[in-house]
Amino acid sequence: MSLKSTKTFFLSFFRELFVYHHTSLEFRAKLFASMIASNKVDNSCEYLVLKKIAKEIYKDDEYRVDVLVHTTKEYVNKIIQNDLLDIDHLLLDIDKELKRHKRFVNKINMNHLRSFYACNGDEETILLQTRILEFYESEINSRKRNG
């Protein structure tokens, strides 16, 4: 394991202590995980898209990029392994986070989330991702109306 990957693992594991604004990063990871985990076939394309998006968000912070990717993968793996987490529970958790942290609605970038459409192939994935995006759009509109 290289020094960089060791540091990324360490920062990811202890992100609550060592990563500035870890709740914001965690929220973004959940958003991306919901889109990635909806594709049951293969996630390699999604992880390339995720890395690109993470670099756009955290331009000059390579470790934050790596921690976001690592954290997202953790959530996806929990969903895939059905380790007490599924997409429905993840979406409910995102909804709770939005209620708790009003500013998080500004973290939802629909263009970033739509980028994952480029990776899907089957109809079921497209339908599920569309429903997830509709949920996020509804949350954005609801939060902006209710201030």
Predicted regions and their residues:
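Small-residue-enriched hydrophobic alpha-helices in membranes
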Residues: M1-S34, V41-G147
